Amino acid sequence: MKTALRGAGRVLLVLVALFVLYQLWIFTLVLWWSHFNPSSTSFMELRLDELQAKRPDVELRHEWVPYDRISIHLKRAVITAEDDTFIDHDGFDWEGMQRALEKNQRKGRAVAGGSTISQQLAKNLFLSPSKSYFRKAQEALITVMIEAVWSKRRILEVYLNVVEWGNGIFGCEAAARRYFRVAASRLGPAEAARLAVMLPNPRRYEKQFGPRLAAHARRIRSRMVYATVP
């Protein structure tokens, strides 16, 4: 009995050590990426694997652009559409989560999310689209790391450069050129609002941008002038 307990204890210690090492590895990358741009993300690698399973020669559309070369209209539109308390929160919008929970309960299904830009970035950089309690806990921990190390300006810069905007399309520069044939720096208010409302489901809205989504884009355009941008 004692031998079995000692064995179980060793296994537990090994698991704890591996968990701690994994968190240290993530934190090291967070520190590194506070000064250097990530060349890829977990989401990018996942999508590339999916695309190459059908077409081995396919490549992602992605081009990094610095913060100052991203349209102010896109920054305002994305904050308005995805996280209107971005400047003020510490990574989590507790009131937004509560509103999303209440809306989902009324509808009887998941129709709204309460994830902030920081949480979405944590998921995009390190995790997968899968849903589990462990993944949500890991997302929260990475969000704390990012908010502790990066400025809001850096968070928004990385987010706009790595977020998915269509099938194989990542980052605002690739999205601007794909949908409007302009650089990200030249996006106007209407174009920025349209890109912003695609973010919840970009691969679907790339093909199905109907009247309801167009109306949502107009609402975002009317409100985004009030957004505070870092």
UniProtKB/Swiss-Prot annotation:
Catalysis performed (reactions): [GlcNAc-(1->4)-Mur2Ac(oyl-L-Ala-gamma-D-Glu-L-Lys-D-Ala-D-Ala)](n)-di-trans,octa-cis-undecaprenyl diphosphate + beta-D-GlcNAc-(1->4)-Mur2Ac(oyl-L-Ala-gamma-D-Glu-L-Lys-D-Ala-D-Ala)-di-trans,octa-cis-undecaprenyl diphosphate = [GlcNAc-(1->4)-Mur2Ac(oyl-L-Ala-gamma-D-Glu-L-Lys-D-Ala-D-Ala)](n+1)-di-trans,octa-cis-undecaprenyl diphosphate + di-trans,octa-cis-undecaprenyl diphosphate + H(+)
Entry's transmembrane regions: 11-31
BP GO terms, sorted: cell wall organization; peptidoglycan biosynthetic process; regulation of cell shape
Chief location of this protein within or outside the cell: membrane
Subcellular location: Cell inner membrane
EC nos: 2.4.99.28
Family the UniProt entry places it in: Belongs to the glycosyltransferase 51 family.
Keywords tagged on the record: Cell inner membrane, Cell membrane, Cell shape, Cell wall biogenesis/degradation, Glycosyltransferase, Membrane, Peptidoglycan synthesis, Transferase, Transmembrane, Transmembrane helix
Superkingdom as given in the UniProt entry: Bacteria
GO MF annotations, alphabetized: pentosyltransferase activity; peptidoglycan glycosyltransferase activity
GO CC list: peptidoglycan-based cell wall; plasma membrane
Protein name according to UniProt: Biosynthetic peptidoglycan transglycosylase
Function: Peptidoglycan polymerase that catalyzes glycan chain elongation from lipid-linked precursors.
Membrane topology: Single-pass membrane protein
Organism taxonomic ancestry: Bacteria, Pseudomonadati, Pseudomonadota, Betaproteobacteria, Rhodocyclales
Record carries keyword DNA-binding: no
Name of the gene this protein is made from: mtgA
Pathway info: Cell wall biogenesis; peptidoglycan biosynthesis
Pfam families: Transgly
The UniProt record lists the keyword rRNA processing: no
